[in-house]
Amino acid sequence: MCGIVGYTGERDAAPIIVDSLVRLEYRGYDSAGVATIHEGRLYLEKDAGKLTEGGEPTKLQRSLRKLPGKIGIGHTRWATHGDPNRRNAHPHTDCRDEIAVVHNGIIENFMQLREELEDKGHRFDSETDTEVVPHLIEQGMKEGKSFFEAFVEAVRRLEGSYAIAAICTREPDVILAARKESPLVVGLGDDGNFLASDIPAILPETNRVIPIDDGEIVVVKRDEVRILDAETLEDVTEEKEVQIVEEDPHTLERRGYPHFMLKEIHEQPEAVRNTLRIERENLMEMAEELVGGDYTKLYIVACGTSYHAGLGAKYATELLAKFPVDVVIASEFRYVTKELVDENTLVLAISQSGETADTLAAVREANARGATTIALTNVVGSTITREVDHVMYTHAGFEKAVAATKTYTAQLAAMYTLAVELARHFGEITNKEAEEYHAELNKVPEMLEEVLSWEREREIAVMGGRYKERPNWFFIGRGPGYPTAMEGALKLKEITYQHAEAYPAGELKHGPLALIEEGVPVVAVAQPGGVYEKMLANIEEVKARGATVITVADEKDEAVEEHSDHVIRVPSISEVFSPIVYTVPLQLLAYYMSVARGIDPDYPRNLAKSVTVE
């Protein structure tokens, strides 16, 4: 959830590090800092606050840029231990201000280490777990070890998760780093080398990256990078593959849109088109291989928006392939569901970033029990891709806004394709039917372009402004419409800070109906199909109790008009695939309401794009 950046090379380090940290803002943070070395002295600046406000540099950013030196490390912090203030911001230093450290993750045994170090005379200034690391290194160097030897010894004593980077004035030409269960990549540049938590941070500087694996230590110099096994210190550099990132760095820019979220909403037709075009052959081969196995069940594990995509995939897979699917919140999977996993189990893990801590933990549990694991992610080379048996990619391009949009619809596109191919190979549908389903999916980008036409978007924008002060929202749906309702409610609460809940419409009488009164907004997802008539009855039910009803419905639906205050029309699509189209108006509704409420939808409070701690 925090961000790490390091640079050593021929240019001034601080501006490069700060620009990279700005590109990591989507991860969420409450403070930032940079440390550099110049002429044998450590320079450090840090504080609580943001690096940008309204797209403009803050006072904190301007002060960080002024630090001298050709080597440095930087950090954006999301508070886990200690309040968000200057004292707790990273980098942290030792007693002599010779060593600076930045860290992502949680050090579980930090209190024990802190007490031990305090007994040896070390003084601590913060409440953080991270501060034990520079003091451990300092203690090792006091005992005669080199910076490298002391760093290795310190890392070996840490329990928990971490990505760590350190610099030292006694060896001012090297950055040392280590990783355990927290993402870290090395970037290879022409005039220096880089470290970062995420590839987007350094993409404008270099597209040549090496993902670091758990249990590895990295030695970064301006003209050399070495990667070592943390236990044996064996040099494994030659075994590492340099990946060339094809992503256009301009995708990290707003390109005329007021916010990244709106830009990414409008990029959905292309994201879906690319995913269907590039990934189809891989998915067809995967389906054929999976059907040939002796599998009895499929678990989909995910968090947040990816969980809702998993629910959409469940409906499609069960309806088309007649194969049982359970969708489990990743953080819950390890506690109960894992006991049901064996070698006859498929586990599909969905993670936009490929670094979600709870999802990775679920994958590791599944692997340990002999399951066949599959990942669906947007990031090539991410941790999850290296820990599973099969990989599916969404080809959505980098997504910067915290609230996921284009990766959600791209996830659905990939999993719908897989569901069709599973159904074909299981013999549940004919080849002709499979091709008809694929043809319909290929029309989805055009459908999304219709939904995103200015006329329709303007109607939703007006609606968002009109209802911006309604404090409680309900979203209802049936069948495939229920995960759409869940995603709509999540988007609204994420970026408008209004209370929103989603329910299966059939559950209204079992409690939620007590909360429906005059003026309460109810968003109804009313796709045509087997549940439509019952959904219409549910809409009448809430309308009779005074609710303001906003219905997302097929463009040909005439019956819904008289029961709704507003109808958002979408192109006709099969019920089984409806979430991929019906969700987009709800993204727009949340976006425009957020803007009307004066909230930055790209960076909602308390949330991070990539949740890398449990």
From Swiss-Prot:
PROSITE patterns linked: GATASE_TYPE_2, SIS
Its cellular-component GO annotations read:
cytoplasm
Note the Pfam families from the entry: GATase_6 (PF13522), SIS (PF01380)
GO molecular function of the protein, one example?
Answer: glutamine-fructose-6-phosphate transaminase (isomerizing) activity
Presence of the UniProt keyword Transferase in the record: yes
What keywords tag this UniProt record?
Aminotransferase, Cytoplasm, Glutamine amidotransferase, Repeat, Transferase
Q: Name one GO biological process term.
A: protein N-linked glycosylation
Q: Where is the SIS domain?
A: 286-428, 463-604
Q: Where is the active site?
A: 2 (nucleophile), 609 (for fru-6p isomerization activity)
Q: Which reaction does this enzyme catalyse, per its entry?
A: D-fructose 6-phosphate + L-glutamine = D-glucosamine 6-phosphate + L-glutamate
Enzyme Commission number(s) of this protein: 2.6.1.16
Tell me which residues make up the Glutamine amidotransferase type-2 domain. 2-223
Predominant location category:
cytoplasm
Positions of transmembrane segments:
none
UniProt-annotated location(s): Cytoplasm
Subunit composition? Homodimer.
Q: Which HAMAP family match?
A: GlmS (MF_00164)
What the entry lists under PANTHER family is as follows:
GLUCOSAMINE--FRUCTOSE-6-PHOSPHATE AMINOTRANSFERASE, ISOMERIZING (PTHR10937), GLUTAMINE--FRUCTOSE-6-PHOSPHATE TRANSAMINASE (ISOMERIZING) (PTHR10937:SF0)
Function (record text): Catalyzes the first step in hexosamine metabolism, converting fructose-6P into glucosamine-6P using glutamine as a nitrogen source.
Q: What is this protein called?
A: Glutamine--fructose-6-phosphate aminotransferase [isomerizing]
Species of the source: Methanopyrus kandleri (strain AV19 / DSM 6324 / JCM 9639 / NBRC 100938)
